[in-house]
Amino acid sequence: MDETTIGLLSVIIRCWMKRGKQRKIQTPGQQKRWHIFGAYNWRTDELIYMNAKHKNTNSFCEFIEMLMNSVSGERPVVIVLDNASYHHSRDSKAILAYFEDRSMVYWLPPYCSTLNPIERYWRHLKEWACSNCLFKVIDDVIQSIESVLTIQNDLDNPNRFVYSKTFC
């Protein structure tokens, strides 16, 4: 489980340009941000996510509660967390303790967020939903993100991101 931030300003990824020329990109003039909390369910191959206006303890606790209520209690839920400050807050530790009988929390080493498998999906999401595009308002970005998230949870869609179930 992890969170990512999506912004209104354009992100340029793999763009053709003539040598010596830099592409000029229009921008809306001000940055606005939106946050997505997400967890990948290895059993169902689906992404459980929640949009949030703020990336803080309250949003994190709300997502953990939503996550734990959306999965069956047959097996423990493995939660992989990085060292964001709000993951270590008193309220965050309280909600993780509340669900400790149904979950196993693994803390990543500091500055090693790339070890979290969902980071690969966040890169895919940003490439497909908002790279090389100009959005006038943050609602357009959110709509684009929602469409890619919907594709991800459609198991028959050929454009979805597929996780490798084996590691070398």
Task: Locate each region found by the language model.
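Short glycine/proline- and charge-enriched loop/turn segments
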Residues: 16-21, 100-104, 122-128
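RNase H-like polynucleotidyl transferase catalytic core
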Residues: 22-29, 97-117, 133
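Short beta-strand segments
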Residues: 1-2, 77-85, 107-109, 162-163
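C-terminal anion-handling pockets and recognition modules
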Residues: 118-168
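Extended, low-complexity cationic-aromatic segments
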Residues: 1-65, 165-168
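Short, glycine/charged-enriched secondary-structure capping and boundary segments
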Residues: 13-16, 92-96, 120-121
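RNase H-like two-metal-ion nuclease catalytic core shared by retroviral integrases
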Residues: 81-83, 90, 106-128, 139-141
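RNase H-like DDE/DDD metal-dependent nuclease/strand-transfer catalytic core used by mobile genetic elements
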Residues: 59-104
